[in-house]
């Protein structure tokens, strides 16, 4: 098994070297490192599409047909332990089958294999509308029913044989693997021990071995026996528990060696318990092995960025977290749903993403197009590992070298500095001490005059570029703002108080009373003046509307006129 994995690693490594030579030449990693952009060598891309189904039938109790009933008591005790483990699991499977009914609409003829699940219809959901979990359970149930006949045959065969491993291939090419617990141990050790050591001693040995196997069973299948859901299954645990090379048995010629290694490394093999037989103490697992397809000529690079220095100022280049490079394409990669192995990324779909044109040209080496932003806080990374050493912005950091913690500086004309085991050994950055790899080499690819693009806003709303100037302005105007605050605190204090409102009301009432008093006094004064001086009254005839002819009659006016005539 070890040699098999080593061959897979060698083949995958060779393919990766070829792809790296063809594709990674697009990305000038040396030039980007001088502005703090760190890009690794990259890994290949594989798409996990469909899967192959396999079934494993586990016989948990060995066939013990020893003379004089040796080991029978130990087997009974072992079965009682298994009942505690398997009865809840069987009840859950019975409940699932009661909730989901699968009907087959195809015609069953003699000699005609049963149709695949695509011919089956999920008919009735006892609790109402089918949820996604119920549909998934229905699929597993239908697949189990299709393989039920073959599984039943191999179960019957296992009860009649003393082999520890049996393999059956059904009509559609799917393999059913049967593993019998401790059968080789019973055949090779317990039976000979009866004649040599006696029945009692052999039975004790069998009891101890069964107890050990029970705890090994919990270790290998703890996640599967605890739920009927789909869980990752480690074939190495099965191989160790049943002393069989299950990896080679469970794979076919359609799965390449490098794919087998990636599947095992990332633990992508899923197992689900689909049947529990308490009469024979057998458990059936449905195992799904993903089929991987490698995308040729594609590498996914992991990218990161640290701050760098230009003329004493600290800047930061924004790059995608992962870069996908292809012969005619360079963009980002969304690996949210992907699994990373040592040599590849395994994704359910193509993870390629578009990135702005400026970022593409920046990654291709045109640093004048790199989107940069000025660093105004200490949250930006200051160092990173590369080629077994450390690349750091020593101007913005406190760096030491060696066990003596000797302070080191950086040329202000360089964006970053590279530290390795040869020129430093123990590296300290802002109090963090790092030991460089002894095999690491100097990652400086030559001093270059750095020219980067103008500072731009990397988000729709980004004020970080002017934050430093705004901070200085606020510091300069702090005294004036304090004075203005004091003035504003004084203004509005007198008319917003309760005492001020009461005072205003009292003043208005007093003014109103004074006005009323003045009017009354003037009226009385005028009246008293008219009553006290009657001679000064205006003659009545001056203002009367009576005709003056009346006065002529009463005052002798007509007599005077007659005398004149």
Swiss-Prot record:
Site (Cleavage) location in chain: 116-117
Membrane-spanning parts: 501-521
Gene3D superfamilies hit by this protein: 1.10.287.2480, Head and neck region of the ectodomain of NDV fusion glycoprotein (2.60.40.1690), Newcastle disease virus like domain (2.40.490.10)
Ion transport in keyword set: no
GO BP: fusion of virus membrane with host plasma membrane; symbiont entry into host cell
Keywords, ordered alphabetically: Coiled coil, Disulfide bond, Fusion of virus membrane with host cell membrane, Fusion of virus membrane with host membrane, Glycoprotein, Host cell membrane, Host membrane, Membrane, Signal, Transmembrane, Transmembrane helix, Viral envelope protein, Viral penetration into host cytoplasm, Virion, Virus entry into host cell
One GO CC annotation: host cell plasma membrane
UniProt KW Transmembrane keyword: yes
Cytoplasmic side: 522-565
Annotated stretches, region: Fusion peptide: 117-141
Residues exposed to the Extracellular side: 26-500
Glycan-modified residues: 104, 245, 449
Coiled coil: 142-170, 466-491
Compartments reported by the entry: Virion membrane; Host cell membrane
Signal peptide: 1-25
InterPro entries: Fusion_F0_Paramyxovir
Family: Belongs to the paramyxoviruses fusion glycoprotein family.
Domain observations: The cytoplasmic region mediates the interaction with HN and M proteins.
Subunit structure and binding partners: Homotrimer of disulfide-linked F1-F2. Interacts with HN and M proteins.
Record function comment: Class I viral fusion protein. Under the current model, the protein has at least 3 conformational states: pre-fusion native state, pre-hairpin intermediate state, and post-fusion hairpin state. During viral and plasma cell membrane fusion, the heptad repeat (HR) regions assume a trimer-of-hairpins structure, positioning the fusion peptide in close proximity to the C-terminal region of the ectodomain. The formation of this structure appears to drive apposition and subsequent fusion of viral and plasma cell membranes.
Name of the protein in question: Fusion glycoprotein F0
Gene source species: Sendai virus (strain Harris)
Lineage: Viruses, Riboviria, Orthornavirae, Negarnaviricota, Haploviricotina
